[in-house]
C-alpha cells in the first residue's frame, strides 16, 4: 500500500499502481470529473499516471492556470488530428497552449482559409465525441526517429535530434493520431467541450526567416459553452474598445506613417496624459521621492559600463557626435546612477528615492508595433531607490503600497509574479540568491500570493511584476520592482557608513505605470474611452438650446472654468437631440442642457453619461458636486 497526502492535509491509503484519476474518483466523483491534471510530489502529471510511491497530491481544475494549459494543449492535439484527417499530407510542427487558447503550425499543400474553420471544428467535435483515451508512451531515441521517419514527419525528427542525449522521449496517442509530446494531457478527448477555431497566421519554423514558412491555426477551448460565449463576447467588445480607433475618434492620439512606432498626442490626449503625470508627481512627492531628469542621448562608454551594450544593443538606436559613439537611451537607470554619484552620501540620507518621467527609445520590429501598446518611443515612470541592506524589505513593501494605491484608483485588480535569474545574467549565484530571497520575504511579510517565473528576471537582478486585470478580463504587466546589487558595483556607488568608511548601497529599480503611453492605451480600452471624471479631457459640455440661451451658456462656462473644471460649449445651430447624441458619442461625463427656463432660474439641466437625465440643479449646487467628484477621483 502507498500513502497519499491531499491538499487539505488528510491522508489516504491505496494499492500501489493506482492511477491519479482513480484516486480522484475515490475522493469525489465530482472532483474527478472537474480535474484535468494533478501535481504529485511537486510534478505536474497526467491523471492517467500510476502512483508507485508515497506522496502529496493536488488535483487541478480549469480555474488553475496549469490545468488550463493542459486542457488547451490537449485541444491542440485534437485540432492537429482533425487537420490530418481532412488534409492527410499536412506535416505537423508544434502546437502549444497560449494565453486564452492554443495554436498548431502545419506545413501543408492546402492553403488554409477561414472557410475551412467550420470543417475543422466539425471534425474536432467528432474526435471529442469518440472520447478516445489519450495514452502516453515512452520511446528510445531510435524508436522515436524510426516512428516519425516512417510517417515523414520531418519537423518532429528535427525536434528529436535536438533533444539532449539523456532526454525522456514520449508520444501521446488518441485514436489513430500520435504526436511527439512531453505532456501532460487530459485522460481522454471526451473531456473537451466547447471549441472554436479563431484565426490564421504565417509563422517561420522556429521563428527564423531562414526556415520554411508554416501555416498557424489559432483556436480556443473551454469546459463550458457559456464560458466560450462569454470569451467571444468580450473579444467583440474589445474590438469596439480598440484604443487605436477610440484614440482617433476622441481626439486623443494617432500613430502616423511618417513616424511608425512614434505616437502623436493630440490636445485632448495631452490633458489625459498630464493628469496621469500630475497624479504620479503628487503621490511620489508624498512618498518621499525627488524628481530628476536625465539626457536622452548618452555615450557608448556609459552603456558599456552598465551592461546594456552587451545585453540590449539590438534594441538600441545610435548616433555619432564629435566623432564619438552615442546611444539614445533605452532605459533610464544609468542616468539615475550618474545623478547619485554627483554627491557624497551619508548613511543618514538613505533611503534616497529619485523618480523620473524619462523618455526612452527601443527598436522594435515593425510587425510587432501596435498603437500605444507596442511603440518605439515611450515615457517610463522610473524611480530608483538607493538604500542600506537592512532597509531592503521595508522599501520593497513601500513600493508595493504605492502600486496598490495607483491600481486601486483605476479599479484594477492585479496579481504578482516573481521572476528569477535568467540564462544571461550579471553577477554571482550567491548575490542572485540574496536578492531573490529579499523579494520573497517582502512578498510574504505583506501577505501577497505570487507565482514564480523561473529565469525571467532582468539581466541585473530578480524582479516582482504586477499584472493588472482590465474590464475585459485581460491581464497587462505594468508595474515592476527590480532589486539590483550589480549596478552599484559597476558604477562604484558608495555611501559613508556609521563607521566613517565607504560602503556599497543596494538599489531598487521600479515603475508603476510602466509606460505612460501603454497605460493610456490600457485605460482607453478598460473604460471604453469613458474615462473617470477627473481624467476626462472634457468634463462638462454646455448645450444651449437656442440663441437666446447662449449668453447664459457663456456665463455657465465662465463659472465652471473659474472652478477649475474642463468645460466647453456647443454653440452650433443644431437640434438639441443631435448635440446630446454627439456629446454621448464623445463620452463626455456631464452634458448641461440650457434653455429659457434654466437661464431665468439660474439652473442647469444635467445629463450624466451613465445615469442619464438627472433633472434641473442650481448651478452652484452642480459646481460643488462636480468639484468634489473630481477632487475625490471617483471612478
UniProtKB/Swiss-Prot annotation:
An annotated Gene Ontology molecular function: ATP binding
Catalyses which reaction(s): tRNA(Thr) + L-threonine + ATP = L-threonyl-tRNA(Thr) + AMP + diphosphate + H(+)
SMART domains the record matches: tRNA_SAD (SM00863)
Keyword hit for Acetylation: no
Record's cofactor remark: Binds 1 zinc ion per subunit.
Domain spans labelled TGS: 1-61
Keyword vocabulary terms for this entry: Aminoacyl-tRNA synthetase, ATP-binding, Cytoplasm, Ligase, Metal-binding, Nucleotide-binding, Protein biosynthesis, RNA-binding, tRNA-binding, Zinc
Keyword hit for tRNA-binding: yes
Record protein name field: Threonine--tRNA ligase
Gene name of the record: thrS
Amino acid at each position: 500500500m502507498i500513502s497519499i497526502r491531499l491538499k487539505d492535509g488528510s491522508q489516504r491509503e491505496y494499492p500501489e499502481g493506482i492511477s491519479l484519476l482513480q484516486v480522484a474518483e475515490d475522493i469525489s466523483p465530482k472532483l474527478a470529473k472537474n480535474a484535468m491534471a494533478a501535481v504529485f510530489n511537486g510534478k505536474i502529471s497526467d491523471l492517467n499516471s500510476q502512483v508507485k510511491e508515497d506522496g502529496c497530491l493536488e488535483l487541478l481544475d480549469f480555474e488553475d492556470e496549469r490545468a488550463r494549459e493542459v486542457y488547451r494543449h490537449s485541444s491542440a492535439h485534437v485540432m492537429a488530428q482533425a487537420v490530418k484527417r481532412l488534409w492527410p499530407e499536412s506535416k505537423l510542427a508544434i502546437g502549444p497552449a497560449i494565453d486564452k487558447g492554443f495554436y498548431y503550425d502545419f506545413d501543408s499543400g492546402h492553403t488554409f482559409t477561414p472557410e475551412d474553420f467550420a470543417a475543422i471544428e466539425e471534425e474536432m467535435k467528432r474526435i471529442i465525441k469518440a472520447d478516445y483515451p489519450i495514452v502516453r508512451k515512452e520511446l528510445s531515441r531510435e524508436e522515436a526517429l524510426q516512428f516519425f521517419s516512417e510517417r515523414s514527419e520531418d519537423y518532429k525528427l528535427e525536434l528529436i535530434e535536438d533533444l539532449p542525449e539523456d532526454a525522456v522521449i514520449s508520444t501521446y496517442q488518441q485514436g489513430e493520431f500520435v504526436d511527439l509530446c512531453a505532456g501532460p494531457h487530459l485522460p481522454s478527448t471526451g473531456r473537451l467541450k466547447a471549441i472554436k477555431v479563431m484565426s490564421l497566421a504565417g509563422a517561420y519554423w522556429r521563428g527564423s526567416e531562414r526556415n520554411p514558412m508554416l501555416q498557424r491555426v489559432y483556436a480556443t477551448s473551454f469546459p463550458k459553452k457559456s464560458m466560450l460565449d462569454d470569451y467571444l463576447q468580450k473579444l467583440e467588445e474589445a474590438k469596439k474598445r480598440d484604443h487605436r480607433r477610440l484614440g482617433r475618434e476622441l481626439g486623443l492620439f494617432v500613430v502616423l506613417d511618417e513616424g511608425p512606432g512614434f505616437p502623436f498626442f493630440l490636445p485632448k490626449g495631452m490633458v489625459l496624459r498630464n493628469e496621469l503625470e500630475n497624479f504620479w508627481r503628487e503621490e511620489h512627492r508624498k512618498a518621499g521621492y525627488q524628481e530628476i531628469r536625465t539626457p536622452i542621448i548618452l555615450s557608448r562608454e556609459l552603456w558599456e559600463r552598465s551592461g546594456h551594450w552587451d545585453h540590449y544593443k539590438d534594441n538600441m538606436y545610435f548616433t555619432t557626435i564629435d566623432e564619438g559613439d552615442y546611444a539614445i537611451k533605452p532605459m533610464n537607470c544609468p542616468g539615475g546612477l550618474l545623478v547619485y554619484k554627483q554627491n557624497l552620501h551619508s548613511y543618514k540620507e538613505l533611503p534616497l528615492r529619485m523618480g523620473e518621467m524619462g523618455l526612452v527609445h527601443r527598436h522594435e520590429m515593425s510587425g510587432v508595433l501596435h498603437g500605444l501598446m507596442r511603440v518605439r518611443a515611450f515615457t517610463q515612470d522610473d524611480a530608483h531607490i538607493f538604500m542600506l541592506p537592512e532597509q531592503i524589505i521595508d522599501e520593497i513593501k513601500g513600493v508595493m503600497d504605492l502600486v496598490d494605491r495607483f491600481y486601486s484608483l483605476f479599479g484594477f485588480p492585479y496579481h504578482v509574479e516573481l521572476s528569477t535569474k535568467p540564462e544571461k545574467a550579471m553577477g554571482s549565484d550567491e548575490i542572485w540568491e540574496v536578492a531573490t530571497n529579499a523579494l520573497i520575504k517582502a512578498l510574504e511579510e505583506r501577505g501577497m500570493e505570487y507565482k514564480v517565473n523561473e529565469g525571467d528576471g532582468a539581466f541585473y537582478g530578480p524582479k516582482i511584476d504586477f499584472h493588472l486585470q482590465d474590464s475585459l478580463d485581460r491581464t497587462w504587466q505594468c508595474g515592476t520592482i527590480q532589486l539590483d546589487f550589480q549596478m552599484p558595483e559597476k558604477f562604484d556607488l558608495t555611501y559613508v557608513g556609521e563607521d566613517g568608511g565607504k560602503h556599497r548601497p543596494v538599489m531598487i529599480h521600479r515603475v508603476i505605470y510602466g509606460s505612460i503611453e501603454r497605460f493610456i492605451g490600457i485605460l482607453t480600452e478598460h473604460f471604453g474611452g469613458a474615462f473617470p471624471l477627473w481624467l476626462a479631457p472634457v468634463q462638462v459640455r454646455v448645450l444651449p438650446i437656442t440663441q437666446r440661451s447662449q449668453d447664459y451658456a457663456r456665463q455657465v462656462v465662465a463659472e465652471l472654468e473659474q472652478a477649475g473644471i474642463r468645460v466647453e460649449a456647443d454653440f452650433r445651430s443644431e437640434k438639441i437631440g443631435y448635440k446630446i447624441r454627439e456629446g454621448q458619442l464623445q463620452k463626455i461625463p456631464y452634458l448641461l442642457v440650457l434653455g429659457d427656463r434654466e437661464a431665468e432660474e439660474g439652473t442647469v439641466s444635467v445629463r450624466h453619461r451613465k445615469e442619464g437625465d438627472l433633472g434641473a440643479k442650481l448651478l452652484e449646487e452642480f459646481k460643488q458636486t462636480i468639484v468634489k467628484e473630481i477632487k475625490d477621483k471617483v471612478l
